[in-house]
Amino acid sequence: MLRSADLNFKNVTLNGKYSFQYIENSVFENCNFATKDAFWHAKNVIVRNSVIKGEYLAWYCENVTFENCLISGTQPLCYCKNLKLINCRMENTDLAFEKSQVEATVDSHIISIKNPLSGSIRALSADSIIQDDPQSCCEIRLG
């Protein structure tokens, strides 16, 4: 599904690399994805009630929303614009949100958050928060 538009997936299970790169204007509901580099450069995408496992999720995406999702894997959601997470859970996620403009409500622990650019992140807890870039102005609230 490279460079596709107007996709509408429901109850789909997918196991494969580089899925949904450069897609636009698409909706995914009740899906289960085991993938690498999914949703890179995606625009105007909504993912609801789904499980996404794999590394480097959704880098360079724009206007992407994850709602009631489980996200698992290293370095997810980096270099994003207008990224939203609504009531999501994260497992085994480290170095998340690097250089992203994000509004996130995460109902779980995050291993590490690295230099989110702007917005706010609410999570139950995090092992480490790395904000060593002076441009990282995101509000991070734990608890």
Identify the residue ranges that each predicted region occupies.
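Long, distal/terminal scaffolding or interaction modules
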Residues: M1-G143
